[in-house]
Regions:
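Outer-membrane beta-barrel transmembrane domain signature of Gram-negative proteins
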Residues: 1-42, 228-259, 274
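Residue-level signature of outer-membrane beta-barrel architecture
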Residues: 29-34, 39, 62-65, 78, ...
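Outer-membrane beta-barrel signature, preferentially recognizing the C-terminal barrel domain
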Residues: 70, 82-141, 145-146, 172-196, ...
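Short loop/turn motifs that connect adjacent beta-strands in outer-membrane beta-barrel proteins
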Residues: 35-39, 69, 135-137, 204-213, ...
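Transmembrane beta-strands of outer-membrane beta-barrel pores
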Residues: 1-5, 45-51, 76-82, 91, ...
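Transmembrane beta-strands of outer-membrane beta-barrel proteins
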Residues: 41-43, 58, 72-74, 127, ...
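Gram-negative outer-membrane beta-barrel transporters
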Residues: 143-148, 154-285
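C-terminal beta-signal and adjacent terminal beta-strands/loops
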Residues: 221, 276-288, 312-370
Length: 370
């Protein structure tokens, strides 16, 4: 990269000490009023002042109960986020992989702070439904976040693809790539939307305890960011959902993530069986024949793993101090992460999938008895 400070002495990693400060003040207000027997109103506002920037962000929420077991809720508000001190002033260097014109290589990647970053603002909207009974609870929420000046880190690959000879690219006298310099920037416009889903049910097993089931999931509809390759004078937004996004200033965005939890509680014992699912997505990198013969394709498969856990009392150590044990098998069936062609990097998506396989977790907990 093109860091010219102390961190320039490092290649595989490093950075520099930062000595910066700023003043921050904030005030928060919240009030709630029942308008009618079944209609509630909540108003909130937050004022923040950070150095020369300030913002007043209100939020209004309404909840309506057409019957005892059903609640409809809607809210709308704004938010204000200052860039962190690290995003503005820090610098660091690491070794990373990029794909240049003539192949894939590891090069020095420098990331420097941007003191000219502006605060990010957003408008947040939510509409949801809740059903709640003695043994069932169901909720679904549609949400949308409309960002302005969202703070994002530049992607070395996106910088290289946009301008292979640009000012952020360092090459030697032979034209070989040796470094890429990135920073943080304000993304002009970002629009994100999706739904959150939750379901809970309790089974009463009488003398055999209780069985609890829970399902929680998120599904993205949109993750729109500017298309850097567009020649249009107006901002063109592209949906990044369901893609690896190797050539953009973001990361892989699977559409669906779903977790389920099954828990059996009997006296002082507890057994859990969980499932974690991540949906498939597309990799737009060109797959060479040599990689295709090894099983790589443009599709990154879905990922489903199971966990098993046990909690049990071990005994009383002394006086009123008890010892409990917790044992868990993470990724019970030793599922490998889906293949991802991203040469010369790893063969899996480091941001999405866990490559560690089956793991045993053992914990002991001391507690005071009543």
């Amino acid at each position: 990269g093109k860091i010219t400070k102390t961190a320039d002495l490092f290649f595989l990693g490093g950075g520099q000490n930062v000595n910066q400060s700023r003043n921050k003040y904030g005030a928060f207000f919240e009030g709630e009023q029942e308008l009618f027997d079944s209609l509630g109103l909540r108003l909130a506002a937050r004022y923040e002042k950070v150095d020369n920037f300030s913002s007043l962000d209100p939020k209004i929420s309404l909840s309506y109960n057409p019957m005892d077991q059903i609640t409809l809720r809607i809210s709308r508000g704004t938010s204000f986020t200052m860039p962190s001190m690290a995003q503005m002033y820090s610098s660091d260097i690491n070794l990373g992989s990029v794909r240049d014109l003539e192949g894939s290589i590891f090069v020095r990647q420098a990331r420097i702070g941007n003191p000219d970053l502006k605060p990010a603002t957003s408008t947040n909207s939510n509409f949801g439904l809740i059903y709640n009974s003695d043994i069932n609870r169901f909720s679904i929420d549609y949400w949308k976040i409309d960002y302005r000046d969202r703070i994002e880190a530049e992607s070395s690959q996106a910088i290289l693809d946009l301008d292979p000879q640009g000012p952020s690219i360092t090459r030697n006298e032979n034209g070989e790539l040796i470094a890429v310099t990135t920073t943080y920037f304000n993304e002009e416009s970002t629009l994100i939307s999706g739904i959150d889903l939750s379901y809970e049910h309790i089974f009463d097993l009488s003398d055999n305890g209780i069985l609890e089931f829970a399902l929680k999931g998120t599904s993205f509809f949109k993750f729109l960011t500017p298309d850097q390759t567009s020649d249009d004078t107006e901002t063109v937004l592209t949906n990044r959902i369901g893609k690896f996004n190797f050539d953009t200033h973001t990361h892989a965005l699977p559409r669906n993530r779903i977790n389920s939890f099954l828990t059996w509680k009997y006296k002082e014992y507890e057994t859990g069986f969980n499932a974690r699912y991540i949906s498939s997505y597309e990799n737009n990198r060109t797959i060479p024949e040599s990689a295709a013969s090894l099983g790589y394709s443009s599709k990154v498969d879905s990922f489903l793993v199971f966990d098993l856990s046990f909690e049990l009392p071990i005994g009383v150590l002394f006086n009123n101090v008890s010892l409990d044990g917790k044992f868990a098998l993470i990724n019970l069936f030793d599922q490998n992460p889906p293949l991802l062609y991203d040469a010369p990097d790893f063969s899996f998506d480091t941001r999405v999938h866990d490559p560690r396989g089956r793991m045993l977790n053992i914990q002991f907990e001391l507690g005071l008895m009543d």
